[in-house]
């Protein structure tokens, strides 16, 4: 009967006393009276304590509500005393285990209070502007979409908690044999680690509306306390001892010691994530850092969607949201988790491509706003309508980066972050064939040995998921195997970094090539895929695909290079045999007035090491400049060779003799012109004599 009253008091505490009245109550001394107080329509509760009895009478109709029935259903009335005792003693009590820690922070904020700023509406979004800077209210634009009204926890927690009735959004992330459940509410968030037998649950925030069943008290589960929040840890003693002993000692203590605002949490997550990637933990069993990353992911979304009331510049809002989305992309890539989006409807209004310009976000034209908005829209899983002029901006973005770095200069961190967004856009596009093919072929061309050296040196200091990106991690460079990478790095005595590089490539590189119909069936093959506008070149060490093939003969026996050409919309047919074979012919003349060499590729390869690099050629002038001796691109080395891939599927060999002949022919043309001018000048003077 104690459980009934416990449940009743819980109902009262949730809904208030407004509609709940105890009609009759009395106290009497035992054996002093025999008066009967039973009445129809009332439930009588008698509580005996030594020589005193307390009697409560409550209307039966109060127990007809569904949620009341659910509360009573959550109580086990068949539990024996031994079971009850075992239930009490088996849980992990942070206070008795000396695991409780209390922190006092001085919270600060850079959020601008709402003042007498001017207002304007852009894309149905109310904005404020002051001194040409546009602001939005973070409490509005960061509202999370809560799609459920009751958050249901795993079965193991029914021993401790009554059902939680809160608006919430719940997501499940499957990782190997572990399920991470994240439930976000306006007051707190819950993250549980479920392995089938040994579950761990964290609850963080304002936990005043979470009710524990007797004899448990909330204070028994407090694991961390800050100025404004409590962190509850609910699990068994044996679970901590057998699987997660680190929870007794340390759990993100550096977070609680700081002002855990959004920017700090994002930076902490990125630092942990980059180390996690390089150390090869992705796809491995759950460890301490896995706990940290999943908790930080939930904590960041919780604080992002519930804390702060004031104004922030639109660009800062956009960049922060981009970082939040990137955290989710990391989980998808590293933990192989299925996409499970948390939706922010007001943020979608900011992702508007229909406006002429983005001056309300920033007047800095070097910031790739179109790429940012496309990344966010595609990451949300939405089908977006992007005008052609915006796609052109994105295309110009990747072309500008390529033009700057095609002759092997080091990429800056902002440029790497930009390329990360472009790569994600290229991986996510279903339609827009032209732009996604352009993105992938230029990324593939930006990957060369020098970029690999620069990137490897940078990995020691990288602390950000986006700036950690290299174009060598594009989905179409599956030819970069452990052996190839080790060979490249060994030339600079960097082969000790091979594992770090391969760990990073395996996370960033999209596994499937389903965005390209003609090569989707060979996603697992070790090959390079070069996506020109209407055809795709595949370079591999064996026959893998039905198409027109070219075999490179100027390599040693141990090195094989097979080039296969497939049309844009052809059906992907894997094969181990020759399908249609052509010979590679030398090219004798590279001059053209019809842009024959536009949108082509120059491929450098070595007799022993195989493919070295690709260079995308936008027009004939670029090709002439590339093979000019002054650019030092052409290496006069008997082991090094060059091929020219044209956009029509033709493959030619560029030889040193051809280059010299081309240069000589140009000199001869100039010489002929000079001779003709001299002859004409002489004829002119002869005619003047008559």
Swiss-Prot record:
It is found in: Virion membrane; Host cell membrane; Host endosome membrane. Residues 1-16 form the signal peptide. Residues 17-667 are virion surface. N-glycosylated, O-glycosylated, and sialylated. Residues 689-690 are intravirion. Glycans are attached at residues 24, 34, 51, 137, 206, 410, 534, 569, 589, 648. Pfam families: Herpes_glycoH_C, Herpes_glycop_H. Residues 174-234 are annotated as: Interaction with gL. Disulfide bonds: none annotated. The heterodimer glycoprotein H-glycoprotein L is required for the fusion of viral and plasma membranes leading to virus entry into the host cell. Following initial binding to host receptor, membrane fusion is mediated by the fusion machinery composed of gB and the heterodimer gH/gL. May also be involved in the fusion between the virion envelope and the outer nuclear membrane during virion morphogenesis. HAMAP family: HSV_GH. Belongs to the herpesviridae glycoprotein H family. Interacts with glycoprotein L (gL); this interaction is necessary for the correct processing and cell surface expression of gH. The heterodimer gH/gL seems to interact with gB trimers during fusion. Interacts with glycoprotein O (gO). This is Envelope glycoprotein H. It comes from Human herpesvirus 7 (strain JI) (HHV-7).
